[in-house]
């Protein structure tokens, strides 16, 4: 079943329930399979024209209700919306602006009195520029004559990409080290197959944000050795900047050399180490260095591999209980430190957090509300007088939260019954029971009468 938002009797919300034929998808607007709602060209006194029947295997246009058509937003007669119907040739995509295949709308270089110039024909297999309407061209945002938009047309050589800033292939715009009065210095020529730095215009260089002379931007040019990546902070390959354990008067200690092929820790500057945020002496930052065994990941909280920090069930006077050892290949619960368990937010004794441990059967997911697999909490159909209770339960008996799901079926979070849903209208305000809308029986018996 589905809910239909139009074509209904306002005094009878029952028409929201539209029965779905077997294996077919209902339209959420009409309740009829293979139909769509058309938002234009309809009789305002007759919403029935929303029902447009779809031919087999073809998609309807949501604006026109006709397959293989599109709505054109320009070049149309405002008194005749019928011109929205542009027939699409087989296998070709219509332009949403012009209604003509293989055309595009050009936002510049056109006669404002003649929208016909929107129709720019594309050669076979080539993409038109949305700015110029010419294939293999691009619009250049600088170095152009503001009185002559024609200079937007920069011709692209075969197989090469134009720079959107300069209109010249193999060039880039440099944001520093240039003469403000001469934008021509934006043109930095790229050597073959190498990428230019957007900051310096020189291949194989990078800009360093520290350890430089503020009066000499030339020190931005740090040459990169072959095949190695420069550090954006230091300009030296195989180094990293360390944010702790350094002399604030000597930025040189930012240079931590990395062994070949090994990644440095950004906190410690030592490979295969991590910074531990607890269990450390605040007067000795050296305890940040926790060595990781080969190929194993350290916990950022404990510095021990395959452990996790548990936020409950611990002695506040002893942080050591944060160390919960993980069994092989199994994930620990961050709340309990036990594998295949979950923390339940209700049905617990506030003086005994131990009841958070709910054991999960093999391969089944526990409900975070109830701690029982195949159950859900129901958030409606409750007694409005029981304010302390969040859902459909007896304040003295939380057990009624447990709604058992049949095998392999999903429970409704509103009703706790499979194959039902809650309807937000058409109900007796004094009787919330009418929220239970039952799914058709034949939908739950697949292949019972398929031969029919």
UniProtKB/Swiss-Prot annotation:
What's the source species for this entry? Homo sapiens
Protein name in UniProt: Uncharacterized protein FLJ40521
Q: Where is the composition biased (Polar residues)?
A: 29-41, 95-111, 129-144, 163-176, 197-212, 231-245, 265-280, 299-314, 333-347, 376-394, 412-426
Query: Biased composition, Basic and acidic residues: where in the chain?
Result: 177-193, 439-452
Q: Tell me where the transmembrane regions lie.
A: none
Residue ranges, annotated region (Disordered): 1-452
């Amino acid at each position: 079943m589905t809910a239909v938002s139009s074509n209904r009797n306002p005094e009878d919300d029952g028409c929201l329930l539209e029965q779905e034929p077997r294996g077919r998808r209902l339209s959420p607007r009409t309740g009829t399979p293979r139909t769509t709602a058309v938002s234009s060209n309809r009789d305002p006194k007759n919403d029935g024209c929303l029902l447009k029947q779809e031919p087999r295997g073809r998609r309807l246009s949501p604006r026109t209700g006709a397959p293989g058509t599109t709505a054109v937003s320009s070049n149309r007669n405002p008194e005749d919306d019928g011109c929205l119907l542009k027939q699409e040739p087989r296998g070709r995509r219509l332009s949403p602006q012009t209604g003509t295949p293989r055309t595009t709308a050009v936002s510049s270089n056109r006669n404002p009195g003649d929208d016909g110039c929107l129709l720019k024909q594309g050669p076979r297999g080539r993409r038109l520029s949305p700015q110029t309407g010419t294939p293999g061209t691009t619009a250049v945002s600088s170095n152009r004559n503001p009185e002559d938009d024609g200079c937007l047309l920069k011709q692209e050589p075969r197989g090469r990409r134009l720079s959107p800033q300069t209109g010249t292939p193999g060039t880039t715009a440099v944001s520093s080290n240039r003469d403000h009065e001469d934008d021509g210095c934006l043109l930095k020529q790229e050597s073959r197959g190498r990428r230019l730095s957007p900051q310096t215009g020189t291949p194989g260089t990078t800009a360093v944000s520290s350890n430089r002379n503020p009066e000499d931007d030339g020190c931005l040019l740090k040459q990169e050795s072959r095949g190695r990546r420069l550090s954006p902070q230091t300009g030296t390959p195989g180094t990293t900047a360390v944010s702790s354990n350094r002399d604030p008067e000597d930025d040189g200690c930012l240079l931590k050399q990395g062994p070949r092929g090994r990644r440095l820790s950004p906190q410690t500057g030592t490979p295969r180490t991590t910074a531990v945020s607890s269990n450390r002496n605040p007067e000795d930052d050296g305890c940040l260095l926790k060595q990781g065994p080969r190929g194993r990941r350290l916990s950022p909280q404990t510095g021990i591999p395959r452990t996790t920090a548990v936020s409950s069930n611990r002695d506040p006077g002893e942080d050591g209980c944060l160390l919960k050892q993980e069994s092989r290949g199994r994930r620990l619960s961050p709340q309990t430190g036990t594998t295949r368990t979950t923390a339940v937010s209700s049905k617990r004794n506030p003086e005994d957090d131990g009841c958070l441990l709910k054991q999960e059967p093999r391969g089944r997911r526990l409900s975070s509300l109830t701690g029982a697999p195949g159950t859900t909490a129901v958030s409606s159909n409750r007694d409005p007088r029981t304010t302390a209770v969040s859902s459909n339960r007896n304040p003295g008996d939380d057990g009624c939260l447990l709604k058992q799901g049949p095998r392999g079926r999903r429970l409704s979070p509103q009703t706790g019954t499979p194959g039902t849903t809650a309807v937000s209208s058409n109900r007796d305000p004094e009787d919330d029971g009418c929220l239970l809308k039952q799914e058709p029986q034949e939908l739950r018996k697949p292949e019972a009468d398929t031969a029919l």
